[in-house]
Each structure stands twice: as C-alpha cells, then as structure tokens.
Amino acid sequence: EGVPKSLPALLQSRRIQEKAADVGFDWEKNSQVIAKVDEEIAELKDAIKINKGINEEFGDVLFSLVNLSRHLDIDPESSLKKSTIKFISRFKEIEKKVDIEKLSLEELDKIWNENKEKYNLEK
C-alpha cells in the first residue's frame, strides 16, 4: 500500500520492504538476510532441476537481494549499473586482445579471470 506500481521493479521492491520494516517485519542482522538469500538461491536451483517455477524463484532471489542491499545501505540500481559498466569495460579489453569467436569458453573464462585479477590488483 502506498507504493506506486509504476515504479521500476527494484525501487518498488525496496520501498515495499522499507514499509514492512517500518512495522517490524524485518531481519535484525545482515547474516539473517544473507541466509534468506542463500535459501532463495537453493529454491531457484531446485526449480531449475525440475524445470518448474523458475521465473517465480528467480524473482524471489532478486527480491531477497534487494532486501540485502537495503540492509547494507546500497542502492541496487546504481550497484547494478556499476557492475554492468565494469563488465563492458572488461569485455572490451578481452576483445582487444583476442578473437573471441575463435576461443573456447574455457579459454575465454581464463582470460576473463586474468583480467579480473589485474583489475583487483589495480584497485
């Protein structure tokens, strides 16, 4: 109630969770929220195994991650944008180095991880 349905899904989810928290329906510790994320991921894995309810369980994972972002005081929208920009940057680096279409996924993954390590060292 009171949360516009026209809001983007991440923001709508966060606002609904904030309203629930305002009346006491909330975890006290980050570890409890992380446990809920783990539980939802396990349910998604089960849904994938039986090829049923995948979309719903995926939504539950996203909802629980938005809740974790709220607990960590992270804006999920800007966090996702930042990760997307980071992915694009790393992918472009790989494209400069190799002909992606000629390598196996395993070879590309190795290069990806090398670039990731390089990026982490530069932080």
Give, region by region, the residue ranges found by the protein language model.
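Flexible "arm" and connector segments at domain edges
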Residues: E1-F58, L62-K123
